[in-house]
Amino acid sequence: MPHISSASVVALLSCTFMSIASIVSAGEAIPVKRVPAEWEPQEAIWLQWPGSWEKSFETSFARLSNVIVQYETLHILYDSPLVLSEAQSSIKREGGDPAHPNIQWHWIENNSAWMRDNGPVYVIEDSTMRVQNWAFNAWGGAFGANIPFYLDNQVSNQVAKILGLPIEAIDIVHERGNLEFNGVDTVMLNWSVIGDSRRNQGYTKERANTDLKRHFGVSKVVFIDGVPEGDLTNGHIDGIARFINPTTVVVADCGGNSQCHAPDDPTHAIFDAAAETIAAAGFTVIREPIEGTRNYKGHIFDTNYMNWLVGNGFVITVGFDNPETDEAAKVRLERYFPGRDIYVIEALDSWVAGGGVHCHTNDQPAMSTIRSPVLSD
């Protein structure tokens, strides 16, 4: 499989968009049931404000919030009046306005600050939008049996009630952070997550393939496999491979200055195998280099920028307080998402705890996406 350099990305994407346009103009049917891609217009972004054991995330959450409200509505869930007060103080401290007209506050009890995973999946079917609530058990108990998750399991129901949308309960344990949609016909995910026996005992890939097609309206399911070193989620797709348009996927690549650079490193092998699997499924693959490491609070980890959030006119990715690699990642994201403003927000405490910007946020598609998919900017 050829390696496509970031320098070739702009020309490649131009050709890709022309190819997509020709497919649509040729009259290819758009599925009646689908999940909009993340780059499509959004109604809002949601997050659960960190409290108690996650208070160290507050500064990065405030910075994240202050960017989002410049572009779209932000719904913030808080667990108690104390958490609300702390959240508002943090936003002020970082130069924002907690009374900004684009912020809506909701007192909804929850257990954690990872709303990507326990929050809603939005599905369009027959010209209506519904909320899917997939079962959640705190990543298969990755953080121990004493970590509660009952309240997190109810958040999707609460969101649906606020929005006045119908709710569909899915009796399969899974997280939205392990779902990548191209908005047309494909879902991409890591089998090591949904097939984890701590989540779904006895679940088979054949059954998953059938279930995913039925629940999402896709005709193609692409499974990668493997758990990167130190990944507490068991390998969520949003740290490994991301769609940037309906036919192009960016896949992490272990560079020479990364911990996983050795060819026989298990993480290196997982990323390479993912790229090969995705290319074999018919998608163009761009490799996203991991160019350095970071030592923070005794933890040494690679600077992996894959965990980005796409919003209305912007992209935010996790920053590692490493000026060289942070800036290089920003330049690459400008190529992947031309026309959008790019932000790199330091979130080291989140990363040490197991995730980044994408993991904390949950995007709500705009009602306009009911009509037809938006293929690119």
Language-model features: where?
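Intervening/peripheral non-core polypeptide segments
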Residues: M1, S376-D377
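Bacterial N-terminal signal peptides that target proteins for export
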Residues: M1-A11
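Bacterial N-terminal signal peptides
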Residues: V10-A21
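Signal peptide processing junction and immediate N-terminal pro/mature segment
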Residues: S22-A26
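The feature marks the mature, well-folded catalytic cores of soluble enzymes
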Residues: G27-S376
